[in-house]
């Protein structure tokens, strides 16, 4: 729990120091690493998404999760969602998180 909190705070500090990171990188990272399952529009309506019953990132169910919860899912995986620890940098995880938050 403490490790997740420290990781989340570190990610938020990096994001605060680099405001242009999200604008330039987030959609590209999402498209490259997430869209195959979650869809380019993040609704989960891909063939894989429908089969695995992937949640729509625009939904209140997803948006009510804390940044720490979403960061943990992205890095460690959950259920059928694979872990991206070691596959995404902390900055890329932050970009994906900010992209998800932009879908409100």
Question: Where do the model's predicted regions map?
Answer:
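Positively charged n-region of N-terminal signal peptides that target proteins for export
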Residues: 1-4, 9
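Sec/Tat signal peptide C-region and signal peptidase I cleavage site
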Residues: 5, 18-23
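Soluble non-cytosolic domains of exported or imported proteins
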Residues: 24, 64, 87-91
């Amino acid at each position: 729990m403490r490790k997740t909190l420290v990781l989340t705070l570190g990610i938020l500090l990096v994001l605060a120091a680099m405001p242009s990171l999200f604008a330039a990188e987030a959609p590209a990272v999402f498209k490259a690493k997430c869209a195959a399952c979650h869809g380019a529009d993040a609704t989960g309506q891909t063939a894989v998404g429908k089969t695995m019953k992937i949640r729509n990132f625009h939904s209140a169910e997803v948006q009510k999760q804390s940044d720490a919860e979403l960061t943990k899912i992205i890095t460690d995986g959950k259920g059928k969602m694979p872990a991206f620890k070691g596959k995404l940098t902390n900055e890329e995880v932050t970009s994906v998180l900010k992209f998800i938050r932009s879908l409100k």
